[in-house]
Amino acid sequence: MVAICFSSIHVDYNFNAFDCQALTNNVLKVYNIRDMNINDIKCFLLDLDGTVYIDGKLIAGAKQAIERMRKQGRVIFLTNNSSVTKDRYVKKLNDMELGVTELDIYTSTDATKNWLKKNRPFSRLYVVGSDEVISDYAKDFCVTPPFDTVVLTFDKTLTYDKLVKACDLISRGALYLATHPDYVCPMETGYIPDVGSFIMLVEGATKRKPDVICGKPYAPMAEGISEFTGVSPRFTAMFGDRLMTDIKFACDNGMTGVLVLSGEATEEDYLSSGLKAIVKRSIAEWDR
């Protein structure tokens, strides 16, 4: 368990190449990461949006790639997207004939719940989310007033009234959690605002950053997935299309990072980031 002091938490959203390189060098020293042979990997963590599919359309060769991964180790679909519940991901992935259960999926919602259970189990949550997401939190926590905690999720039903309520609670000192820091979510036609954009809006209104961000690249997600899989980070690979969430997550937590160029990041972005990763055009090429 990570000890966290709410009053001293500072989240820096402005990463530069120098900072990332310094951090990566430090992590390499701490975790003694070597250039991992992909054949040594026992757990494959796969981002979804931009890695396995884009806007609901399976990336070419992804199904066959996942089948090959399963012959070598465990495959977990690891996503920051907190807009829907886990059962929706099961249906979506099975509609793509990927053959998954809830035991094959771990989300930023899972990481958020796990953090709350360990650190604030009796919280009364004001969840900025869809009705189904709120109902999901209600299985484990109280989601009725008086609220003492705000949980900001990727709410595609976001309204002005929800923002007003959340900002009022945050301004009055409520514990403030965000599920993940992604600014945008990739769609087939472009990008739409994600939780990172909501965070900036809330900060502009309240002058507060989240006390805890639970998804990639932060510690709550790493702790949660480690407990979920039981596999050492040394034998775990994170596949994703985003440098500052997926690949930074791998670097910060002793995993092998595999950047796929099927989503947000380009090869030029990677070269200027200072982060350490294997680079592939898509997940289909993971073992080539």
Write out the residue ranges for each language-model feature:
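Non-catalytic pre-domain segments flanking phosphatase-related domains
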Residues: C5-V11, F15-L46
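Asp-based, Mg2+/Mn2+-dependent phosphohydrolase catalytic module
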Residues: Y31-L46, I54-K71, S83, D87-Y106, ...
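Conserved phosphate-coupling serine/threonine residues in phosphotransfer and NTP-handling enzymes
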Residues: T79
